[in-house]
Every structure is written in structure tokens, then in C-alpha cells.
């Protein structure tokens, strides 16, 4: 199951889930995705159960990407414990999900839309929130999160490059040493 290797603090406050997801709301790796329709906490066990259901259905074909990670610890007190004496110990980890967040992605040569839809439907049953199946349009490419645009867009064209070089030499010659008047 998924959990962080180490954290700065052992315990966190519960927090509030307001608004919609502004990050992680576009298909970045595969052709098909499962998108959250409402907010909620998804535990590492639920993520693992969904992943198993999808991989079991698609067998060896294609690839599955998990786009959420359980990084929030949830603490619990032992049963029949009196009030006070501090916060409980971390029991499990959850991923905080807002509406619009992509949860899982799927892609590959052998994966058709029907196979992906059925695999995502099986994964939906394991999750505590409403979700929606998404597919990229024919010929559309994923957005590739974390990749820089091609280098050519950073380089200036030949005309601007030579003009900038000339302007730089003119400016440096004009601002060269001027005699001081005493």
C-alpha cells in the first residue's frame, strides 16, 4: 500500500475540502482517465483495491498510472478511551481529492475504449466518491505533466539574435571609457 517514506510531522489536522482541483485535472499520460466528481478522502487501501481491479481486468495489456498519493495521516484513539491525554496515533493514510482531479489513467496499444471503460467501472466500485470516465479525442495527445516545451521555442530567431548582438556591441562601444574632466 502507498504511504510516504518519511514526513516532517507525524500528525496533521483534518482540514477542509473546498473548491475544485486546479492541478492534476487534465489527462497527462494515457488515453483514458477516471475523474473525481466530488470531494473526499481516498485511503491507500481503496487506491490499491482499485488498482488491482483494473489490472486484473486488463491483464497484461496497457499501462495504468495512479495520479493521487495518500500523504495525509489520519489519527485514531483506542476504543473506550477517556477524553483528553492528547491526539491519537496515525492509523492510515489518505489522499485528499477535490472535484475534477484525475485519479487513474490508462493507455497502451491493446487498450480499447470499451476495455478501459469496463476496467474503470470496476475501479469506481472500490472508491467512496462519484467519478466519471474520460477519453481523449481521436488524435489528441496527453498534456505530459512536467515536460518542458521544445527547445526551439526558447531560442530567438536568427534575425532577432543578430540584431541583439549588434545592439549589444554598439551599446558597449558607446559606454566605453570616457575621459574624466578635472
Swiss-Prot record:
Any single GO CC term annotated in Swiss-Prot or TrEMBL for this entry: ribonucleoprotein complex
Low complexity compositional bias, start-end: 162-176
SUPFAM superfamilies: Ribosomal protein L16p/L10e (SSF54686)
Keyword RNA-binding in annotation: yes
Keywords associated with the record: Ribonucleoprotein, Ribosomal protein, RNA-binding, rRNA-binding, tRNA-binding
GO biological process terms on file: translation
GO MF term set: rRNA binding; structural constituent of ribosome; tRNA binding
Highest taxon in the source lineage: Bacteria
Key word Phosphoprotein present: no
UniProt function note: Binds 23S rRNA and is also seen to make contacts with the A and possibly P site tRNAs.
NCBIfam families hit by this protein: rplP_bact
Family, as annotated: Belongs to the universal ribosomal protein uL16 family.
Name recorded for this polypeptide: Large ribosomal subunit protein uL16
Source organism per UniProt: Prochlorococcus marinus (strain SARG / CCMP1375 / SS120)
Amino acid at each position: 500500500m502507498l504511504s510516504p517514506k518519511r514526513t516532517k510531522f507525524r500528525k496533521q489536522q483534518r482540514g477542509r475540502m473546498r473548491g475544485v482541483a486546479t492541478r492534476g485535472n487534465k489527462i497527462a499520460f494515457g488515453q483514458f482517465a477516471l475523474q473525481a466528481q466530488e470531494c473526499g478522502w481516498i485511503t491507500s487501501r481503496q487506491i490499491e483495491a482499485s488498482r488491482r481491479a483494473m489490472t486484473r481486468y486488463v491483464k497484461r495489456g496497457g499501462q495504468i498510472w495512479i495520479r493521487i498519493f495518500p500523504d495525509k495521516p489520519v489519527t485514531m484513539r483506542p476504543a473506550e478511551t477517556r477524553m483528553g491525554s492528547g491526539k491519537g496515533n496515525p492509523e492510515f493514510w489518505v489522499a485528499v481529492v477535490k472535484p475534477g482531479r484525475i485519479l487513474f489513467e490508462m493507455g497502451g496499444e491493446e487498450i480499447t475504449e470499451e476495455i478501459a471503460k469496463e476496467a474503470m467501472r470496476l475501479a469506481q466500485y472500490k472508491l467512496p466518491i462519484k467519478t466519471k470516465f474520460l477519453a481523449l479525442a481521436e488524435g489528441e495527445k496527453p498534456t505530459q505533466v512536467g515536460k518542458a516545451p521544445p527547445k526551439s521555442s526558447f531560442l530567438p530567431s536568427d534575425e532577432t539574435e543578430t540584431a541583439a548582438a549588434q545592439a549589444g556591441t554598439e551599446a558597449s562601444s558607446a559606454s566605453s571609457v570616457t575621459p574624466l574632466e578635472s
